Amino acid sequence: EVNSVKPGQQDLVFPWIGCGECDACKEDRESDCAAMRIIGLKQKGGFATHCLVENDKFLVDIDGLDAADVVPHACSGITVFNALEKMGALRSDEWIAIMGCGGLGMNAISIAGAMGFNNIIAVDIDNGKLEAALEMGATKVLNSQNDDAVSELQKLAEGRLMGVLDTFGGAATGRIAVRALSKAGRYLLVGQAGGDFQMPQVWLPQKAMTVRGSHVGNSPQLRKIIEMVRQGKIKQMPIDRRPLSKINQAVHDLENGNVTGRIVFQPDEND
């Protein structure tokens, strides 16, 4: 019997459901659960009009907010928030680069600014997306198709590039990141485009570099983000609202890089 929620209640679903038994789950670190059951991947509920949520701890109140605007935070929002927390604070004269200006990168720029990262360089190969990145709060931008992308990134960061958040995760972004970082810099990888890049192992001790992965985020972090949205701290990234029946065209547009921000599907009128 369900008595903790009411019909018509507007909630955002946290989809990264942990096993509930391991130490990570008991500490609300669902993203570290080795047996995570993801709604939409490992259990039904993605690209659907309904889904089953087993516990109200995975529901976040969004009453009064536009659901389409905030729903990306249950994926891209917590992903970059979690990674930026792991990154740690930077000094006022230090810089962070955000590699990739897709939906994940756009949210990263906005959330990084809300978390106190003041010097942000957005990196992408699409000038249109770089323009959008400036509107989202990036301080500077770099088109990494430039043959001198490493040195250009170092110049833009005034020799103080202490953090890179890679939201793409390809061979090219990894290669640029580890070469451009200043000594004691931190490379956080969240993107999963795939690929390999090489770097001399000796760079890790000689540059005192941190290379770390981060996977999605946790339910308390989602609540923090939604509270930041309510407080007006997070700038709204572009949202492309489409009917669920147009999903195939949306996938095609994503594959061809024709989307700025995030696509959010909404049920068709007859659903």
Region annotations inferred by a language model:
Residues 1-23, 63-65:
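Glycine-rich beta-strand-centered segment in the early N-terminal region that forms part
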Residues 175-178, 183, 219-271:
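C-terminal hydrophobic helical "lid"/dimerization subdomain
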Residues 88-91, 115, 125, 131-210, ...:
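Glycine-rich cofactor phosphate-binding loops and adjacent beta1-alpha1 units
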